């Protein structure tokens, strides 16, 4: 397959995700397919966003990394220190993605590292590993193209997250401001009772302890639920299960006091 054909393969996959969040697992699989490599797509802080590995590469250490969805902090630091593409790294180098405990198996292995940039900042790293063959100039062109596209997608997701957080914050504050003084007091005591973002509430118990009516608690919960801030589910005599849906809610509630 020519370099142009491989580039088009990557483009075709990304076009399918236009307007929606990219599945980095799919992208890793496609990069692996067109470059014939083992692939890690890693965030700036070491989170594994996507990967595609053959069985040979897997070891106890690699399996643990995949389970944790995170690479070791020492390796993350080494990756971040790489400012431009470094190719054909051998097994004895600390930057090799291959497990050193299996050195004899991967004696001819090669690792290539592509920094992922976007908006003038480091967003992550694309790590490719081959068991034997060297990376060619065409491989490097394709890898750098993939890293550029990944940077654009990660940056777009970051912007989407910021926008969503702003919308959530606005919805939370509107919900809090809609509460009466007694309802806000009830909500504060409810989450003090729960001791976290979810748990089982016995409304009558809180009402008796705080000295408010049960209807105040019910009204307060209803307002928050209708605003999409929490969800609740009646468990009959056991009480009501409550869970915060918007992560910033408890912080904003505390700030509003």
UniProtKB/Swiss-Prot annotation:
Database matches in PANTHER family: GLOBAL TRANSCRIPTIONAL REGULATOR CODY, GTP-SENSING TRANSCRIPTIONAL PLEIOTROPIC REPRESSOR CODY
Region (GAF domain), start-end ranges: 1-155
GO molecular function, one term: DNA binding
Keywords, sorted A to Z: Cytoplasm, DNA-binding, Repressor, Transcription, Transcription regulation
GO biological process, one term: negative regulation of DNA-templated transcription
Name of this protein: Global transcriptional regulator CodY
Function text: DNA-binding global transcriptional regulator which is involved in the adaptive response to starvation and acts by directly or indirectly controlling the expression of numerous genes in response to nutrient availability. During rapid exponential growth, CodY is highly active and represses genes whose products allow adaptation to nutrient depletion.
Subcellular location as annotated: Cytoplasm
Gene: codY
Annotated Gene3D superfamilies: 3.30.450.40, Winged helix-like DNA-binding domain superfamily/Winged helix DNA-binding domain
Gene Ontology cellular component list: cytoplasm
Source species of the chain: Staphylococcus carnosus (strain TM300)
DNA-binding region(s), residue ranges: 203-222
Similarity comment: Belongs to the CodY family.
InterPro entries membership: CodY, GAF-like_dom_sf, GTP_trans_reg_CodY_C, Transc_reg_CodY_N, WH-like_DNA-bd_sf, WH_DNA-bd_sf
SUPFAM superfamilies xrefs: Winged helix' DNA-binding domain
